Amino acid sequence: MSGRFALFRWSQSLATLPGFPVGQAPHWNISPGNQVLFLRHVGGELQAASGRWGLTPPWLNDLSKSPAHARAETLSEQPMFREAFRQRRCLLPANGFYEWRGELRKRPFWLTGEGSLLHFAALWEAYPAGDQVYLSVAMITQPAAHLRRPLLLDEAQQHAWLAEDTPLAQLQALLLIPTPPLRERVLANLVNDPKLDAPECLTPA
């Protein structure tokens, strides 16, 4: 499962988007429950926002059960994700993500793309609480051999995913796109500590 990723470097064009958080800090070890940067369309305009990684629909009573992931194969049918899939799609920018492999002793791997940023398909929700509205997201994952990985979108697919008028059939087709080729390297075990959020997370084995 894609339980950790990193966003420690971004472009100037991303940093100048409306809603980009003031003082956005670099992170090397983002886990479910953390605040994450995400991109969405608001009135047809691309905007940035910050939300909790763990989807909290307005009707959810037990916030401890907020899912961090949504399976691409079933999200269009599940009540937790169905409405957000149709109306509240977003992207999670990342420099890469971590993957643990092995039978007895799992080793962490760092996976990146050709460019400086990857974009994960995701869903967002707004949770009203008193006079505050809290935003949250769920990462969409797809099967990759015996693992699950984020659903990665290229530039054209990103536009289609965010557009409010994309037909449902096209959205469902995006859920089936294969994982593109990725670069990977095995890491030391420092990243295993979820409290470590520093460049040392990427220390090679």
Segments and roles (model prediction):
Residues 45-86:
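A glycine-rich, hydrophobic loop/mini-helix early in the fold
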